[in-house]
């Protein structure tokens, strides 16, 4: 979640913030972008490499079609215009984590242009369209690890496929940035394009920020949600102070230290990357129908799911709908039970099932109480084969013991079978109610004085005495009769 550490932060209405983002997103492919090395995130250093990944002479790149497909899916999800022609270029620079001496990217002819992402009420933001300049496919670099006396380089990450998404400078406050990044994470993870995790490096964010139209400052490699907020707040306040003191803003690249931003290089010292087309990779030529075909293949996007869940027939509040959206397995579970017990699905799922897990401090697991089990329990209660109290006892037992018994077996194990309706049962119910009335004169007085809710106290004691075998309505009818 996003956090705000600069508690004294506030916007100065005389100094307008403008911000744009560059988001680098690792694609969830089996193999790397231009080689058959497996993508690797937690393997020992330098164990998932090919000759091409480390730039050995004579090796050549070959485009991974899975990476191209994921990049195209992202382009469609973000309403971008897929280009019929795109190509790869070499971005030259020298750094230990880039063994080729250049990065393969799409500088001149990117994969997609002119997209947008809508922020709205579901993001707790007034309607705002954030335009996307382009989406390009490119390589990730290796990873450097600094020690006191040396730098170690791990090339497992080198040549991992990325998309770089570049927005227009449309953000007018940091809240919009938060909402955009959160929504972006949700969409790429929902479509299984990327894990969407900032903290693991699967997503990395660069921010360009300016105040009152002055030169922009780029903040590089913001690696967590907290860093994005803190760095933008700090940099906005730094630029405002400079302007208030009559000083200018230098166009430069800065880095986040954890406490502030520091200058890395100025515009005058900016790197000349000497972009040239990559002669070893053919251009990508796509059919004009590719966008329509991809649109048909995409699942429901998050906003569409939320819109569906908060309206008929589900009628969920937005908080419940969002909780389901962020947990795809749980959403599937909910929709499965809703198809069978629609009228009672919300009550049983949120008030009974999730409560049974929460009361025991256990995280909800769709495998512990399968949808078919919950549906069976609900139907047994509806046909009065077991009571509501018995159903709660069964859920409690399953959660605590991870029971795989059938419902019939659980009713037997827990001795919850409802007694046969006969005169003997009616007499037993009457005797229990009479004893409870006798033992609770204060509650009876409250009921006599018009406190109708006090009747639930008596019913609760009766249910406890019978271990949930008898329905609450049977006790309620008997208590009302005896208390007339």
UniProtKB/Swiss-Prot annotation:
UniProt keyword Ion transport, yes or no: no
Entries under PROSITE patterns matching the protein: GATB (PS01234)
Alphabetical GO biological process terms: glutaminyl-tRNAGln biosynthesis via transamidation; mitochondrial translation
Cleavable signal peptide: none
Subcellular location: Mitochondrion
Role of this protein: Allows the formation of correctly charged Gln-tRNA(Gln) through the transamidation of misacylated Glu-tRNA(Gln) in the mitochondria. The reaction takes place in the presence of glutamine and ATP through an activated gamma-phospho-Glu-tRNA(Gln).
Assembly: Subunit of the heterotrimeric GatFAB amidotransferase (AdT) complex, composed of A, B and F subunits.
Family recorded in the similarity comment: Belongs to the GatB/GatE family. GatB subfamily.
Record's protein name: Glutamyl-tRNA(Gln) amidotransferase subunit B, mitochondrial
Organism: Candida tropicalis (strain ATCC MYA-3404 / T1)
